[in-house]
Design a protein with these regions (language model features):
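Boundary/linker segments of alpha-helical solenoid repeat arrays
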Residues: 27-33, 77-81, 111-119, 145-154, ...
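TPR/TPR-like (Sel1-like) alpha-helical repeat modules
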Residues: 20-25, 139-144, 162-187
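TPR-repeat structural position
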Residues: 13, 62-63, 97, 131, ...
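Flexible helix-coil transition and linker loops at the boundaries of alpha-helical arrays
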Residues: 1, 9-17, 22-43, 71-80, ...
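Structural motif corresponding to the intra-repeat A-B loop/turn of tetratricopeptide repeats
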Residues: 10, 59, 94, 128, ...
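Generic helix N-cap/helix-start motif at coil->alpha-helix transitions
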Residues: 1-2, 11, 40-50, 76-85, ...
Length: 222
């Protein structure tokens, strides 16, 4: 699975799909792997289905995922949440927003929902026109994760949504936060972020522009 992991990280989903098709899942182990503390995780067969479903979704073949995902959900109860998420993502990619929303709502209706599930749920709500609810859930996602570098896209989307609903200061704070984190990590900054920040600076016409991540983070939480 090392090749699959590398291809996934590079976003080479066609390669992922080709590799999984060269493997017969029925001959793969169903014994869960364990970590150093003895906790059980994924097995080879469940990993195969995960890679296969993701590859189909990312290559615009989500309808094929829906043909087998329910069986997989029942087959691997330990990974149930992840496969149900893939079902929701398939519906979303196919434009079936109502079914996607229902599934994400159920997945997130727990004591401590994963931040990335909240993020995906919010995207569905945005497309449903429920922008205030989407913003609330995006902010819930942002405070649920301490790894800022993993949330640069989330911060960008919060910023763009804030701008869309007229919250200009909040929009700039989140876009600057995304930009500053990208700079610190040595990542490129999309023109859409830079251009929107300049536009907001012109609209706000003030001197409260944060110069570092801590300042931007504090402003985004106000």
């Amino acid at each position: 699975f090392k090749v699959l992991k590398a291809a996934k990280a590079a976003g080479e989903w066609k390669i992922v799909n080709e590799w999984v098709d060269n493997l017969n899942p029925e001959i793969l182990s169903t014994a869960p792997m364990t970590d150093e503390e003895g906790r059980e995780g994924w097995c080879d067969q469940s990993l195969w289905y995960n890679y296969k479903a993701r590859a189909l979704i990312e290559t615009d073949k989500s309808e094929k995922v829906l043909q087998f995902i329910d069986e997989v959900i029942n087959k691997f109860p330990r990974q149930k949440k992840f496969f149900i998420r893939l079902k929701a993502l398939s519906y979303y990619k196919l434009g079936n927003l109502n079914d996607a929303q229902d599934i994400y709502k159920t997945l997130c209706d727990v004591r401590r929902p994963d931040w990335w599930l909240l993020h995906e749920y919010a995207r569905v709500l945005v497309d449903q026109g429920e922008k205030q609810d989407a913003l609330k859930i995006m902010c819930q996602a942002a405070v649920s994760n301490k790894k800022l570098e993993s949330m640069v896209t989330l911060f960008k989307e919060i910023g763009m949504l804030c701008k869309e609903i007229g919250q200009m200061k909040e929009a700039r704070a989140h876009l600057l936060l995304s930009s500053l984190i990208r700079t610190e990590q040595g990542w490129s900054i999309p023109e859409s972020i830079s251009n929107t920040i300049m536009e907001l600076n012109s609209v706000l016409n003030d001197d409260k522009t944060p110069s570092n991540i801590r300042e931007a983070l504090n402003l985004s939480r106000e």
